[in-house]
Regions:
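N-terminal active-site segment of His-dependent metallophosphoesterases
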Residues: 14-83, 167, 372-390
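His/Asp/Glu-rich metal-coordinating catalytic cores
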Residues: 35, 64, 75-229, 233-238, ...
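Structural beta-sheet core signal
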Residues: 22, 67, 101, 173, ...
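Glycine-rich, Lys/Arg-enriched anion-binding loops that position phosphate/diphosphate groups
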Residues: 213, 218, 224-227, 231-281, ...
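Short, positively charged and aromatic/hydrophobic N-terminal segments
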Residues: 3, 13-14
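Conserved beta-strand elements of the Class I
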Residues: 21, 144-146, 248
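Leucine-biased recognition of intrinsically disordered, low-complexity hydrophobic segments
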Residues: 5-7
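Accessory, non-catalytic peripheral segments of nucleic-acid enzymes
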Residues: 16, 254-390
Length: 390
């Protein structure tokens, strides 16, 4: 039975480990332009996985749900995505005693605002500074959640106003912002955070959103003294977001480090195959076979090819071959070919092709560094392919 948001007594002991579902950066309504022709299919896959969240909450018997910003990709989502969010949150409220949300830098509070039609029983933090905690009594005991809607114009340093309540139970801070030492974009309009600020909050868990890679508490402090966690993006928004994506299941109790587990969203993840040596391959089709054999079931390949080859790799052809097997594939070519036997043979020819090969080799050898060398080699390959030379 769902319990009242009001605490049933001034002091209520924790009855069991509290389980919280923590998500952020779903970006409903994103274009997924990086996925090219697969963009529409990708968008539908995200919506399908998002609709499954109530079942995830039910399966894990969570006591609360936290949404740490950027639920939407813009402050004015289209009606379909707004309706999807309303329905999912309505169903989540049938499973968990409470759902808490903060806006992010992509979906800030405007008028009418992206969260205007969210069910009233969900709590959206709309003040620009953290105030008193919103408290709910759960089957695991009292939960106190602190949050705010960051607005630099109103309060550039909202965490300076944070005050933890002196109350029994689990205390959680819900924050959308970028930790300064994270490998994160340097600009933007997100709240900037520091380890020191997070460590002084005195709460049992800090549910973070904005940074798109899963970062468990151990990445903030090995001893558990900073109980912060980025759940990462719900699903990869572009081809750079490789690896597992989803939501975090948190088990937390007062005065002990939280235990977190990343639950895959169910949207096909991007699998990075970095520096894949294809020097033993004899042609593009063999490269396709080698890559395909390394892709995990249900994943989409993002591969960087490397090695010294005896043929000029055609990354567009390799990518097309992979796209015939997977809904999406991205290929980056970093192979070396300029000092191969084939190119030496071409440079010995007494024709336009030979002249081009010799000129290209001279420019490659005169490059000032490896980056410039690679650029000049790839330019030579493209020029040779344009002349029908493989």
């Amino acid at each position: 039975m769902r319990e009242s948001l009001a605490l049933s007594a001034p002091t209520v002991m924790i009855r069991c480990m509290m389980r919280i579902l923590h998500l952020a950066d779903v970006h409903l309504g994103a274009s997924f332009a990086s996925f090219g022709p697969h963009a529409g299919e990708r968008s539908e896959a995200v919506l399908k996985a998002f609709r499954n969240l109530p079942e995830v909450a039910r399966e894990h018997e969570v006591h609360a749900v936290l949404v740490a910003g950027d639920l939407f990709d813009s402050p004015r989502p289209d009606e379909r995505n707004a309706a999807e969010a309303r329905e999912v949150i309505r169903q989540l409220l049938e499973v968990a005693p409470a759902v808490f949300l903060v806006p992010g830098n992509h979906d800030p509070l405007v008028i009418p605002g992206p969260y205007a039609d969210i069910p009233e029983t969900a709590h959206v933090f709309s003040a620009p500074v953290p105030g008193e905690a919103v408290s709910v009594d759960t089957e695991a005991g009292p939960l106190h959640v602190y949050g705010f809607a960051y607005d630099f114009a109103h309060e550039p340093d909202p965490l300076a106003r944070f005050r933890r309540a002196d109350a029994e139970g689990v205390h959680v801070a819900l924050v959308h912002g970028a930790v300064r030492d994270a490998p994160h974009w340097s600009g933007g309009d997100s709240l900037r955070l520091s380890h020191d600020e997070l460590s002084t909050l005195g709460v049992d868990y800090i549910a973070l959103g904005d940074y798109h890679r899963f970062r468990p508490p151990s990445e903030f402090a090995a001893d558990g003294s900073v109980p912060a966690c980025y759940c990462g993006s719900f699903a990869a928004l572009d081809h750079t977001e490789t690896g597992p994506r989803g939501v975090v299941l948190v088990e937390v109790s007062p005065d002990s480090p939280p235990v977190v587990r990343l639950l895959p969203s169910g949207v096909p993840p991007l699998q990075a195959l970095a520096d894949l040596d294809v020097s033993t391959c004899s042609d593009d089709l063999e490269v396709v076979e080698k890559v395909a054999g390394l892709v995990e079931v249900g994943s989409l390949p993002v591969v960087t090819l490397s090695g010294q080859t005896e043929f000029a790799v055609d990354p567009e052809r390799v990518e097309a071959g992979l796209a015939a097997r997977f809904p999406f594939a991205r290929v980056r070519d970093r192979t070396r070919h300029y000092d191969s036997d084939r190119l030496a043979e071409l440079s010995s020819r007494d024709d336009v092709v030979g002249h081009l090969a010799r000129l290209g080799l001279d420019r490659i050898r005169a490059a000032s560094d490896e980056v410039e060398e690679g650029l000049r080699e790839r330019a030579l390959r493209k020029a040779l392919r344009a002349m029908g030379v493989t």
